[in-house]
Amino acid sequence: MGAPLGEREILLGALPRCADPPCAGTWTRLVMNVLRIILGDQLSLELSALDGLDPRSDVVLMMEVMEENTYVGHHKQKIVLVLAAMRHFAETLRQCGLTVDYVGLDESDNTGSFTTEIQRAVARHRPSRIVVTEPSEWRVQAMAKSWEALTGVPVEIRSDRRFFASRTRFAAWANGR
């Protein structure tokens, strides 16, 4: 048996390979990059937002924003733990060969909000679309639903399969209870 696979090999092995078009070399290749958003409570290589990722062109956006740290009272140690986990996960993605646009809380131009940071990322990367796994909080879900209108870029909100049931399935089960 060979050596055990590391995180990089597991992630890259799960990614589909994009075949070159028949005109490769004849035409300038148009890259249709996707901006893939990972939120602070979504630190998983199995996240639906990463399905179909093309490491040659897609960009993963991760943001430390003040609005997430202040909308309710959080213990300072919890905030430090979440930010440290986010930074570690971003580094793991980079080691897997992915392009990560990481907006740190201490960056002078950080606007402090998901929406404006996504608008800034769209201006930087000019993606063909935005993909995000459905946020776990209704407040952030409402924000995600507004991003397409605010950026002019199609937004795909994917189901979060880290839960036992989708929101739709749970709502059907809970109906009338």
Predicted regions and their residues:
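Extreme N-terminal basic, low-complexity initiation segments
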Residues: G2-I10
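Trp/Phe/Arg-rich N-terminal binding region typifying the photolyase-homology
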Residues: V31-R177
